[in-house]
Structure formats: structure tokens, C-alpha cells
Amino acid sequence: MKVKIGLKCSDCEDINYSTTKNAKTNTEKLELNKFCPRENKHTIHKEIKLKS
């Protein structure tokens, strides 16, 4: 089952990206190094749940 998730910047707390993931195969939370347009640099983005 695919679940909608958001990727939240660890510095500015802004949700910059949204994506889906398979909840059955990937049980751990995502942490990706992505570009934050507000900070204008690459930061760690952590997974949060989005309201459907």
C-alpha cells in the first residue's frame, strides 16, 4: 500500500517535497539530503505524514 509522505527540512521546518512510499516494504523513516530553497543550500529532509 502506497502512503503519501512529505519531506520536511531539518533547519527551517518547511515541507519542501512530497512523494509516496510503500509502507509494507519500507518501515523506517526516510532521511534524505535535499536542496532547501529557503535556506539556499542542501540540508537533511526527514519524512512526515501528509493528510490525505
UniProtKB/Swiss-Prot annotation:
GO molecular function: structural constituent of ribosome
GO CC term, one of those recorded: ribonucleoprotein complex
Cysteines engaged in disulfide bonds, as pairs: none
Record's keyword terms, sorted: Ribonucleoprotein, Ribosomal protein
GO terms of biological process kind: translation
InterPro entries with a match to the protein in the record: Ribosomal_bL33, Ribosomal_bL33_CS, Ribosomal_bL33_sf, Ribosomal_zn-bd
Similarity field: Belongs to the bacterial ribosomal protein bL33 family.
Name by which UniProt lists this protein: Large ribosomal subunit protein bL33
Encoding gene per record: rpmG
